Amino acid sequence: ADKYEKSHLMRWIKALEIVIMLGAAAAFIFNSMLLLIGLLFLMGLQSTLFGPVKYSILPQHLKPEELVGGNGWVEMGTFLAILIGTLLGGVLIAIQGQGPWLVGGVVVILAILGFLSSLFIPRAAPDAPDLRINWNPFSETWRTIAITRRNRTVFLSVLGISWFWFLGATYLAQLPNYTKLTLGGDEHVVTLLLTTFALGIGIGSLLCERLSGRRVELGLVPFGAIGLTVFGVDLFFAAVPVAPEASLIGAVEFL
């Protein structure tokens, strides 16, 4: 993200996504679980490459007072895309006889749309064109952590965002099981809770700009981390597993 021109780099990464999604479409159609697992790894790699670029490009195109709002929009868009994709994928794959074809077609179309969108990203000059890249992920990760520890503010911010993503990914993965086994809800209740989860993230991301007064305000980070932890613990103590023989309830009954 620092060594190369960012808009050009983003286009290459989005082009890579098209190739991966073409492979995913074939894996869905031919029901190749092994290929899907391999492509899932490649999508994780692609996301890892794209993440630093999409965040580091913001300061080069936004004013200082726009940075918090810009980060909020990116964060909201990222989580909404994950949740909508989770819901849409479940709906499409369940369509009898056509599910794999529909899922494969949609992921390829979305990848192409993403690449076309990247063509409109304005240029952003590299911050460190002479940077030497260390291809050893272990030593480079350790070096990066050591660098962040030199600045207490940056290090605590890294811990905060890591905690947020850890909890967010955990909730997203476990929410269907939690809904069925603990709340006794069916797939419609899962959809309802995922939608509520997405709305909460979206509203919180936008409120961050308002609460921070349009400036980078690190004082909000501890409150957010504490809120995530406290309400997570509350969710644990409020959970009462339903009886195994109980029938699942719908969204209307749940409300």
Provide a role label for each language-model segment.
Residues A1-L255:
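Alpha-helical transmembrane-bundle signature of multi-pass membrane transport and export proteins
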